[in-house]
């Protein structure tokens, strides 16, 4: 798929089958960093093979961490108390799950580092995290526009003078980065570290993932709801020996959606009713839209209407603050709803791999949908009968745009996906797996 300028989607009628999900991106990159910071060796299984994880693995190797060869999703990492390499230039692509946590860890450890990424990464805000780290005395310099990468880290005097405050309304990754790095400083300073959240914390399920994984590596965080988090002075990461990565719940959303609009059943394995990922809640969104959703240990299955034969999903008006990535799938499903659909509280879309509100608005209109949008909301009215239009869908160098709009193949219009290779960020084989579930229209 890499290098293809476009992919013409076959007109789809039915979808059924089973998909073994690739590992979660959010969990994979968190576990890689935690394993590097922990005492002892950690064998990781089910690791996602993607651009973002390759960026993190390369950075850890560059920082002197002993990282084994990756084979069939398995890799062994020997933890270090502190990164052996104290001077480096790290290129981190467009991987927020690598850039933000590494910024915090490097800033609190000390050394001289330069962190950069692709042009879009340099448009994604990091100022709130930098402001919080400077409260610890970290020396961080913006090498371009203030508030954004690239960064130079070094030259500060790290200290703990009291609680550190971080803004929570832009990205939960800022709090995740501070939480993951804090045990290193707590133990070195001999002081408890408290992080206080300012404003409304978005994407709370991703913080739950962070706290869950920290606990598996031996660090329990005391918390006061969503307002304050305290890491004890004796906190220390310890490798669990072996760590299995769950399947990616955000990726599951596309396949579960196929079952909801293509009759089904479509079953995903690797996530289930016991998942630690918030995006499994997308299955409840599908149920509210009329899909039959079933759960088991390590699996979720959907059945639904056949939209290619005139079936329709129920329209929705919902707050998607807790599942912003899977919400993109819901926006595309609005093409097949029985009325206008409204997605609220999705302001975080503006600072993702692209401005996703603008991108979704633009591409849904190409297909004939009536679309309105604002700072943190999107409303989609399905195309009128006879109103569907053939479209070349721009993916905006955003893997989730490409995967979401694969669902448009169940409509009556011809759909071409531009730059389909952008799915390599999280799921290089997505379109092959997708095609294996479909029955084409005659």
From Swiss-Prot:
GO terms for cellular component: cytoplasm. Its EC number is 2.5.1.19. Keywords: Amino-acid biosynthesis, Aromatic amino acid biosynthesis, Cytoplasm, Transferase. Pathway: Metabolic intermediate biosynthesis; chorismate biosynthesis; chorismate from D-erythrose 4-phosphate and phosphoenolpyruvate: step 6/7. Its main location: cytoplasm. CDD domains: EPSP_synthase (cd01556). One of its GO terms (molecular function) is 3-phosphoshikimate 1-carboxyvinyltransferase activity. 3-phosphoshikimate binds at residues 25-26, 30, 171-173, 203, 325, 352. Catalyzes the transfer of the enolpyruvyl moiety of phosphoenolpyruvate (PEP) to the 5-hydroxyl of shikimate-3-phosphate (S3P) to produce enolpyruvyl shikimate-3-phosphate and inorganic phosphate. Belongs to the EPSP synthase family. This is 3-phosphoshikimate 1-carboxyvinyltransferase. It comes from Bordetella bronchiseptica (strain ATCC BAA-588 / NCTC 13252 / RB50) (Alcaligenes bronchisepticus).
């Amino acid at each position: 798929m890499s290098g293809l300028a476009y992919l013409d989607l076959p007109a789809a009628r039915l979808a059924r089958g089973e998909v073994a999900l690739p590992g979660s991106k959010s969990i994979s990159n968190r576990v890689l960093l935690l394993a590097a910071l922990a005492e002892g060796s950690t064998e990781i299984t089910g690791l996602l093979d993607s651009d973002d994880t390759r960026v993190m693995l390369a950075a850890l190797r560059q920082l002197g961490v002993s990282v084994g060869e990756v084979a069939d999703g398995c890799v062994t990492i020997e933890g270090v108390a502190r990164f052996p390499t104290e001077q480096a230039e790290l290129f981190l692509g467009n991987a927020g799950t690598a850039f933000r946590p590494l910024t915090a860890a490097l800033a609190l450890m000390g050394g001289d580092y330069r962190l950069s990424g692709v042009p879009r990464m340099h448009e994604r805000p990091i100022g709130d995290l930098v402001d919080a780290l400077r409260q610890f005395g970290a020396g961080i310099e913006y090498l371009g526009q203030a508030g954004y990468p690239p960064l130079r880290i070094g030259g500060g005097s790290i200290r703990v003078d009291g609680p550190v405050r971080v803004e929570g309304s832009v990205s939960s990754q800022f709090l995740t980065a501070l939480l993951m790095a804090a045990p290193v400083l707590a133990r070195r300073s001999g002081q408890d570290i408290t992080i206080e959240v300012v404003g409304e914390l978005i994407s709370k399920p991703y913080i739950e993932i962070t706290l869950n994984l920290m606990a598996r590596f031996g660090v329990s965080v005391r918390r006061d709801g969503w307002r304050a988090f305290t890491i004890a002075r004796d906190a220390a990461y310890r490798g669990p020996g072996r760590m299995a990565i769950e399947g990616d719940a955000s990726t599951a959303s596309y396949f579960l959606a196929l079952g909801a609009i293509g009759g089904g059943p479509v079953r995903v394995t690797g996530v289930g009713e016991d998942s630690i990922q918030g995006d499994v809640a997308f299955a409840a969104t599908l149920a509210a839209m009329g899909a039959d959703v079933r759960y088991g240990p390590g699996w979720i299955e959907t059945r639904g209407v056949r939209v290619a034969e005139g079936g329709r999903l129920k329209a929705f008006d919902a707050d998607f603050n807790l599942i912003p990535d899977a919400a993109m799938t819901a926006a595309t499903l609005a093409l097949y709803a029985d009325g206008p659909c409204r997605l609220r509280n999705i302001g975080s879309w503006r600072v993702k791999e692209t401005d996703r509100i603008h991108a979704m608005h633009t591409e849904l209109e190409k297909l004939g949908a009536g679309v309105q949008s604002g700072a943190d909301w999107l409303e989609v009215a399905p195309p009128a009968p006879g109103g569907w239009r053939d479209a070349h869908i721009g993916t905006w160098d955003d893997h989730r745009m490409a995967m979401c709009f694969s669902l448009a193949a169940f409509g009556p219009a011809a759909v071409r996906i531009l730059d389909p290779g952008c799915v390599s960020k999280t799921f290089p084989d997505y379109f092959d797996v997708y095609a294996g579930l479909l029955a084409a229209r005659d």
